[in-house]
Every structure is written in structure tokens, then in C-alpha cells.
């Protein structure tokens, strides 16, 4: 990092008890977030590997979800999954400079219109669309101010604390499922039974729900 107070940590790409990834983030990303928060880092930014319906788990571990997009000719709106937009607290249209400035304005207007047709994610906050330029720095100060306003609004309404409690329970259940799979994979007999049941499911000889009950019997 260029600044002494900054800390940048790439997530591991390996699979297994300490690795793996799902939803655009590594399995232990939330643990790292909690550790960094306890160490006094604020704010903490999480960058995902991309945008897609399956890459939204980051919204389940962060306070604010940003969707970063580029200017388009107006036909890319349909390409963004509705589920991703519904999770966004801020939608940022980058590259709002030079020859793309006008296109960025049109793209921002398109997404602002789409947001008005969606149910707000929070009682105390309506998602907004902002334009910015990483090249010139335009709009960055406004984004930072909006982030602060978002935090104040959700803390004041009590939604931030409630959201964090809900996230903790969600990640407990998710980690429990992964831990059970780790246990199954680590037991030779159970692992063999699991492979047999997977084959039966693939062949259509057994339904997934029946196979799951069988492995737990």
C-alpha cells in the first residue's frame, strides 16, 4: 500500500477447510473482515471477482453494497441481474469523463429510473446512482459523503445493528453446512457413501432430498 495506514490483503484461491470461494468471495473473507475491524481499520473495502447472480454474498457480510458500472449505450441494463441491483445501496457509474461523460449521464439516468421501480432494501435509505471518474477524481468526494450519510441513517434507525445480527446468523448457518461437508469429506467411509449417493442422484435413481436424508441417517 502507498499509505502506511492502509492494509491490502488478497484472498486465497485454494479450496478446503481454509480456502474455497463462493458468491464472489473467499470462504474466510468474513473472518478477515472481523479481524481487521477489531484491529481498528475503518473503512474496510471488499472487492469481488465480478458481477453476477451468484456473486452477491459480499452483501451478506458488509454494511454497504456498491455496484460499480461503466457507461453503456443504454442496452446493457438488461444484462445486469435484477438481484444484484436490488442489493445495491449505491450504484456508481465510473469513467464519467472525456468522450464518455455524456454516456455516463445517460447510463446513470437509466439506472436511477430502474431503481425507482424496485423495493428499497432499507427503511432509512433509498439506493442512489452517482457518477465518478477514477481518472480525474470527479465525484469521489461525493461518494465518500454518501457513504457517511448511509452509515448515519442506518445507525440512527437501528437497521445497521439488526443487519449485522442477521448476517452473523446467516454466516453461522452457512459455515455449519460447510463444516459438515468437510467432516463428510474427511471420513473415508462417509466419503465413499457420499460418492455412491452422488452417482445415484446423477443417474436419476434417487432424488437429491432422499439422498441427503440417507447420508444423515
For every predicted segment, state its role.
Residues 29, 47, 84, 94, ...:
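Residue-level signature of catalytic and energy-coupling elements of molecular machines
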Residues 11-13, 67-70, 92-95, 131-132:
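Conserved beta-strand segments of the P-loop GTPase G domain that flank and frequently precede/overlap
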Residues 1-54, 61-68, 75-76:
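Nucleotide-state-sensitive switch-loop elements of NTP-binding domains
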Residues 17-19, 50-52, 71-75, 96-101, ...:
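Conserved nucleotide-binding/hydrolysis micro-motifs of P-loop NTPases
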Residues 90, 96-153:
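Canonical P-loop GTPase G-domain recognition
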Residues 67-79, 120, 124:
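Short, acidic/small-residue loops that bind anionic groups at enzyme active sites
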Residues 131, 141-216:
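Long, well-ordered amphipathic alpha-helical subdomains in the mid-to-C-terminal portions
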Amino acid at each position: 500500500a502507498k499509505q502506511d495506514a492502509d492494509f491490502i490483503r488478497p484472498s486465497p484461491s485454494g479450496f478446503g477447510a481454509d480456502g474455497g470461494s463462493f458468491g464472489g468471495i473467499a470462504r474466510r473473507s468474513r473472518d478477515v473482515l472481523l479481524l481487521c475491524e477489531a484491529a481498528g481499520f475503518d473503512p474496510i473495502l471488499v472487492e469481488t471477482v465480478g458481477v453476477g447472480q451468484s456473486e452477491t454474498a459480499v452483501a451478506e457480510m458488509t454494511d454497504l453494497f456498491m455496484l460499480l458500472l461503466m457507461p453503456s449505450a443504454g442496452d446493457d441494463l438488461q444484462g445486469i441481474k435484477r438481484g444484484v441491483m436490488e442489493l445495491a445501496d449505491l450504484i456508481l457509474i465510473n469513467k464519467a469523463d472525456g468522450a464518455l461523460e455524456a454516456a455516463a449521464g445517460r447510463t446513470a439516468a437509466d439506472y436511477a429510473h430502474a431503481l425507482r421501480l424496485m423495493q428499497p432494501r432499507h427503511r432509512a435509505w433509498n439506493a442512489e446512482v452517482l457518477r465518478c471518474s477514477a481518472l480525474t477524481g470527479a465525484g469521489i468526494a461525493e461518494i465518500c459523503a454518501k457513504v457517511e450519510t448511509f452509515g448515519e441513517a442506518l445507525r440512527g434507525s437501528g437497521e445497521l445493528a439488526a443487519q449485522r445480527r442477521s448476517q452473523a446468523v446467516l454466516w453461522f448457518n452457512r459455515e455449519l453446512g460447510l463444516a459438515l461437508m468437510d467432516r463428510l469429506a474427511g471420513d473415508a467411509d462417509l466419503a465413499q457413501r457420499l460418492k455412491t449417493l452422488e452417482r445415484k442422484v446423477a443417474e436419476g435413481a434417487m432424488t437429491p432430498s432422499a439422498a441427503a436424508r440417507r447420508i444423515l441417517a
